[in-house]
From Swiss-Prot:
Belongs to the UPF0060 family. This is UPF0060 membrane protein Smed_0659. It is found in: Cell inner membrane. The chain crosses the membrane at residues 4-24, 31-51, 61-81. Its main location: membrane. Keywords: Cell inner membrane, Cell membrane, Membrane, Transmembrane, Transmembrane helix. Disulfide bonds: none annotated. PANTHER family: UPF0060 MEMBRANE PROTEIN YNFA. GO terms for cellular component: plasma membrane. It comes from the Bacteria. The keyword Membrane applies. Pfam families: UPF0060.
């Protein structure tokens, strides 16, 4: 599976897992929300191990840009708040950084 696809799936799993904690602590949802949230966070961690790189830190660093894009998508789709131009500019810079990390000659 291509790294971008892994990172995209990992971002969805991480955001969904973290949102369950947000829902529990900030929105008053039941603590039972944490069960699928913890499973989702475990899937997130497992997915990052599938990236073809010898160094975990590099996989995590490259993932950061994808996470930012996915978070802004979550903001828009799940929370109904449209990202502004500063959000999009920051995301573009982060995504460029991820691309440099992933594609750099080694």
């Amino acid at each position: 599976m291509p790294a971008f696809a892994i990172y995209f799936l990992a971002a969805l799993a991480e955001i969904a897992g973290c949102f369950t904690f947000w829902a529990w602590l900030r929105l008053g949802k039941s603590g039972l929300w944490l069960l699928p949230g913890m499973a989702s966070l475990a899937i997130f961690a497992w997915l990052l191990t599938m990236v073809d790189t010898p160094a975990a830190g590099r996989a995590y660093a490259a993932y950061g840009g994808i996470y930012i894009i996915a978070s802004l998508c979550w903001l828009w789709v799940a929370e109904g708040a449209r990202p502004d131009r500063w959000d999009m500019t920051g995301a573009a810079v982060a995504l460029a950084g991820s691309a440099i990390i992933l594609a750099g000659p080694r």
